[in-house]
Amino acid sequence: MTSVIYPGTFDPITNGHLDIIERSAVIFPRVLVAVANSPSKKTLFSLEERVELVRQSVAHLSNVEVFGFSDLLANVIKQHNISAIIRGVRTTIDFEYELQLAALNRLLTKGVESLFFPPAEKWVFVSSTIVREIYLHGGDVAELVPVPVFNALKAR
């Protein structure tokens, strides 16, 4: 079975992320969403909370699995027999950075390719960073995040 992986910090998962996951789930029989533990990043939600929020957000997708990881992505890819890495690219700045990561991951995994998904037009401006900034300044993020994330933010 072809399996792809969509790695990210997802702090929090946004509707842009969810759109990419849903589109990937239509194309591929198995999509793994790998929620990264990034000690160098100051996250709003813990790894466990982020994994659970992603799980709740993709519960309607039967071919999507969610897990957290702290290892090198290349090692996770080898452990799960991954065929390709899914990445979202919003801008040319994203693309340049992702191109470098794709080359590195291809080297470290002995050939696993990265597939770049542009966002749907209505999500092109959405990022986890922007969502956190709006939230931390008291703004309304209801239209930018899945319902489980919005509820978790309201409860904080």
From Swiss-Prot:
Signal peptide extent: none
GO biological process assignments: coenzyme A biosynthetic process
Keywords assigned: ATP-binding, Coenzyme A biosynthesis, Cytoplasm, Magnesium, Nucleotide-binding, Nucleotidyltransferase, Transferase
Pfam families found in the cross-reference section: CTP_transf_like
Keyword 4Fe-4S on entry: no
Residues binding substrate, per UniProt: T9, K41, L73, R87
EC number: 2.7.7.3
Annotated site residues (Transition state stabilizer) in this chain: H17
Catalytic activity, reaction form: (R)-4'-phosphopantetheine + ATP + H(+) = 3'-dephospho-CoA + diphosphate
Cofactor dependence: Mg(2+)
EC main group: transferase
SUPFAM superfamilies: Nucleotidylyl transferase
Pathway: Cofactor biosynthesis; coenzyme A biosynthesis; CoA from (R)-pantothenate: step 4/5
Binding annotation for ATP: T9, F10, H17, G88, V89, R90, E98, W123, V124, F125, V126, S127, S128, T129
Family: Belongs to the bacterial CoaD family.
Protein name, per record: Phosphopantetheine adenylyltransferase
Source organism of this protein record: Haemophilus influenzae (strain PittEE)
